[in-house]
Regions:
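Catalytic glycan-binding domains that act on GlcNAc-containing polysaccharides
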Residues: 1-126
Length: 126
């Protein structure tokens, strides 16, 4: 049960496409969780416009939850396959660490702040 809870938290908090290379630049802090998730969402919903995805991520909590779970299941499976000898706890730590490493600075922008608010609700309601 504890492992399952940790995995749920890690999967929702991470919301990064670990298989996707991130663009590293001086403005990396603005390349936030929202933008990473938005870009990764295009992979799952290629027929959706970015405007529609942005709207759904900001206004449809169920869509945001299902997208996060889908992206993060893929990410977690990636780590599990890459490190088969790691414990469940270590895999979760890696997923959370990847999230924290990319998101330590406060990103700017109303979209990001609203999206983080949606995700904190998701985190505590799950």
């Amino acid at each position: 049960m504890v492992c399952r809870t940790l995995i749920s938290i890690a999967l929702l908090e991470s919301s990064l496409g670990l298989n996707n290379k991130r663009e590293i630049s001086l403005k990396d802090t603005s390349y936030s969780m929202f933008h990473i998730t938005l870009n990764t969402a295009k992979k799952f919903y290629p027929t959706y416009s970015k405007m529609l995805l942005k709207y759904k991520l900001l206004n449809d909590v169920d869509f945001a939850i299902s997208l996060a779970k889908r992206i993060l299941k893929e990410n977690f499976d990636y780590y599990k396959q890459k490190h088969p000898n790691k414990s469940m706890y270590q895999l979760v730590e890696m997923a959370v660490g990847a999230y924290n490493g990319g998101m330590k600075h406060n990103p700017n922008g109303a979209y990001v702040k609203k999206f983080r608010c949606v995700y904190s609700q998701v985190h505590y309601n799950e």
